[in-house]
């Protein structure tokens, strides 16, 4: 099932996407379940927004793909690197991203994101499927120059618009550990990888995040990016295509 968040006239609504229609839901599916209102819209007549604005946090992992660590000249860490992105970093499909004034070197990072569905802490790996609401595509934008110069990654990873998510949440994947991720810049393929290349499985990463933090409904976990990252420039359109989910696209401006 695909759960979208969209705007028709005013406030954002949730809906179930089926083919070229979106069927409106009553309230918030994270807390009130899937309750159709009976109203539907053509998908082309609505504006998709970020499928979730995390109420609490985005937990992100770095250097979870060996080849990506190597392309940046980094060693593979014994434990995955964990950091946070604020909810103000989240934007949706087709929303423009303003490049930060403090950086001249912003990179794209196409990723699979996990959306949490219930309050949880210290979740064993085998229990992780019980706390997952679904999955979406993500672009973990990174100001590389700030990442190198700053002692912490807060500015480099957390600037406004640095976490595009979308286009919707897919509640079921056949196998989260075998999902293709393709990132294109202006139509040219830059990343072509798979979660099968992850050093730690998707469920292991969720379990590790729950060891560090209490996870809340709507929290998002970014699982890391495969090799092929590169810079994005003003006017570029970056598309992250995640198998079984769809394509997340954003245009960049100054």
Each predicted region: which residue ranges?
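N-terminal non-catalytic cap/leader segment that marks the start of a structured domain
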Residues: 1-80, 172, 176, 182-184, ...
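A generic local secondary-structure boundary/capping motif
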Residues: 48-50, 71-73, 97-106, 120-127, ...
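Catalytic-pocket segment enriched in acidic/His residues
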Residues: 51, 68, 76, 144-254
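Short helix/loop capping segments that flank catalytic or ligand/cofactor-binding pockets
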Residues: 69, 93, 123-125, 145-146
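Short Gly/aromatic-enriched secondary-structure transition segments
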Residues: 73-79, 125-136
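Structural signature of FAD isoalloxazine-binding scaffolds in flavoprotein oxidoreductases
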Residues: 76-93, 108, 239-244
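Ligand-binding beta-strand-loop-alpha-helix segment within the catalytic cores
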Residues: 110-112
């Amino acid at each position: 099932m695909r759960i979208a968040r969209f705007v028709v006239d005013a406030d954002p609504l949730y809906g179930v996407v089926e083919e070229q229609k979106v069927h409106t839901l009553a309230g918030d599916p994270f807390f009130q379940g899937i309750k159709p209102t009976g109203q539907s819209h053509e998908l082309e007549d609505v504006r998709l927004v970020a499928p979730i604005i995390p109420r609490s946090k985005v937990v992100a992992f770095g250097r979870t793909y060996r080849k990506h660590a190597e392309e940046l000249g980094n060693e593979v860490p014994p434990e995955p690197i964990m950091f946070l992105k604020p909810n103000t970093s989240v934007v949706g499909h087709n929303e423009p991203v303003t490049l930060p004034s403090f950086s001249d070197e912003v990179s794209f990072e196409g990723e699979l994101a996990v959306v949490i569905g219930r309050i949880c802490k210290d979740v064993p790996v085998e229990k992780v499927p019980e706390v997952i609401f679904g999955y979406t595509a993500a672009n973990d934008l990174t100001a590389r120059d700030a990442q190198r110069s700053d002692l912490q990654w807060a500015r480099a990873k957390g600037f406004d618009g640095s976490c595009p998510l979308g286009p919707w949440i897919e509640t079921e994947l056949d196998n989260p550990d075998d999902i293709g991720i393709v990132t294109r810049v202006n139509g040219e393929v830059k990343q072509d990888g798979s979660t099968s290349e992850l050093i730690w499985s998707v469920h292991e990463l969720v379990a590790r995040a729950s060891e560090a933090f209490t996870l809340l409904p709507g929290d998002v976990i970014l699982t890391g990016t495969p090799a092929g990252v590169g810079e994005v420039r003003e006017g570029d359109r970056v598309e992250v295509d995640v198998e079984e989910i769809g394509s997340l696209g954003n245009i960049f401006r100054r």
